[in-house]
Regions:
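N-terminal carbohydrate-binding accessory modules
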Residues: 1-7
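Active-site phosphate/pyrophosphate- and oxyanion-stabilizing loops and adjacent acidic/basic residues
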Residues: 2, 84, 107
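Alpha-helix-loop-beta-strand connector modules within alpha/beta enzyme cores
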Residues: 10-11, 16-17, 68-96
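N-terminal glycine-rich anion-binding loops that anchor highly charged ligand groups
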Residues: 10-24, 48-61
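Active-site mouth loops of central-metabolism enzymes
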Residues: 19-44, 93-102
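A short, N-terminal amphipathic alpha-helix
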Residues: 41-53, 85-88
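Glycine-rich, proline-tolerant flexible connector loops at the mouths of alpha/beta enzymes
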Residues: 50-78
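Catalytic cores of alpha/beta
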Residues: 101-110
């Protein structure tokens, strides 16, 4: 497909996952370390993936357990904040996935 090569620069892109740590509202969110820790870990993973040569990155709320079919507002807001703060460092095409909630995923993507 021609569009794949146009978007990713290759016919067989490697899309890597950047799994975000538990965020505010999640049962396993570490309030002591706060959002700075979530952001720092996401930045570390993003840079490692890009330096490793991936063609794209997908951000996901992997550690927002348990997965919900309707994620909490603070999950979407936290993901938006993290991705927004990393935006200047993102060098490849990227996407978002709010696990089990396609509407929230689209809200973030737009």
């Amino acid at each position: 497909m021609k569009w794949i090569k146009e978007v990713f620069g290759t016919e067989k892109p490697i899309v890597a996952m950047c799994h975000l740590q538990a965020m505010p509202g999640d049962p396993y969110y570490d309030k002591g370390k706060g959002m700075k820790d979530v952001l720092d870990k996401a930045r570390h993973d993003l840079l490692a993936l890009q330096n490793g040569g991936v063609d794209a990155v997908m951000f996901s709320n992997e550690f927002s357990l348990p997965y919900l079919t309707k994620v909490k507002t603070e999950t979407v807001a936290s993901m938006a904040r993290i991705i927004g703060e990393l935006k200047d460092e993102i060098e490849v095409p990227y996407g978002v996935n709010c696990l089990w909630d396609p509407i929230a995923s689209l809200d973030l993507a737009v």
